[in-house]
Each structure stands twice: as C-alpha cells, then as structure tokens.
Amino acid sequence: IRIEGDGMDASRTAQADLLARAVEVNAGIWADKVNVITGVGQFDLEGRLVGSLPTDSPSPEWSIDTAELGGMYANKIRLVANEHGVGVRNAGTVSAGQSGLTVTADGRLLNQGTVAAQGAIGLQAQQITTSGDIHAEGALALDADATIDNRDARTSGQGNVTVRADAIDNRDGELLAGAQLNMTADRHIDNDGGLFFGTQGLSLVTDSMAGNGQWLAQGEIEATIHGDYRHQGEMIAGGNLVL
C-alpha cells in the first residue's frame, strides 16, 4: 500500500485499517483511529498472526515507511510490523491524540522525524534508533531487545518514562521525564555529554556505566550498577542520592 498525492482522509470514519506486507506513507493520513498492520500471513485486527502464507519474494527494508512529507494524524495510532527482521521508519510526523500511540516491530525502529502524542506512547522493537524528537504528554515507554540509540536526540514524556534495553546510548542526547525516569540496561549505559532528568526521581539499573553527562532529579536518584562505573559529570538530586 502506498499513500501519495493528497493523502488519505478517513476522518469521517470510525477507524482506518491498512493491512499489507508493506505500507509507504508519502502523504498525510487523517482518521480518528489508524491501524497499520504489516507482514506475511493472516492476521486478526489485533495484529496477531493467525495463519502463515508462503512467499519466496525478498523482504522489504521497511514494512512501515513514513517519508519526510508523509504523516499520520489520529486520536489513536497503532503500528504493528510482524515480519521478522523488517522494521519501521519515520522521517515525517506521527501524531496521536489522547488515546495514544503504540508501535510494535519485529525489526528495527528508526525515527528521523517527529513522534508525538497527547496521551501515552509505547515503542517496542528489536532496536530503537532516534535522531528526531519523541514526546508524550502522558507516559512514555521504550523497550528494545538490543540497543536504544538516543544520540543527539530528545526523548521525553510528561508522565513516567520507562526505558529498557540491552544497552542505552544517550551520548549528547536527552531523556526527560515529567514524573519518574526509570532506565534498565542489561549490559551498558553511555551518557557521555547527555542528560538524564526525572522531575519526581531517577532510577537506573545496569551492568556498566560510563559518561560525563548530567543526572538531575528534583526527587531521589537511585543507581544500581553491578560492574564498571565511570562518571565525571554532575549528579544532583533534590532528595536522596543512592549508589
């Protein structure tokens, strides 16, 4: 499915569902609810695989690809990329209302544009890389099996922000929470030149940690680091500081 030209205005319908192996968004999509479900097989409307289909054609590089001039604008947006190893790319704008945004990808999630919601945002992928802007006016959750790469990027939520991955790379990046910032990395966190900020507090659990960036919280900062720890930047807590 390719959206081009004047785009797709489904704002007068209750819901817009796009189901295909790959979806290219080169123009705007407007609706109250948008579901984009991609992959090879038979799926129910929740995006679950209910039957397989044989194919000998090569996999696309991106199963959901929003170009710089493309965008999705809806009260609720749900993107599900089911094909193994095939990811989701956004170079445009994906903007949801109070009902929020969820993205689930069985590959890489690459954000080069703007991802925003008046409600909550949940992003889950094998790997998450952002060089653009991610902002939720509600809670924000990022979950990756491999690395979350937030270098030179700004990722924020007005509510709790939860970040979980094998490794978190926040060099020259910003991870900001209007409430509690919780980070868990099984292997390593790099915050060289970066900023971790939690209004209510900041929690960090990892095996090793490095960087000269800032850790700031108006409440408590609590860090559990099982192995190597090298930090040369500021660490300021309005409450307890527990290492």
Question: Could you describe each region identified by the protein language model?
Answer:
Residues 1-243:
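Extracellular and secretory-pathway beta-repeat/beta-biased strand scaffolds
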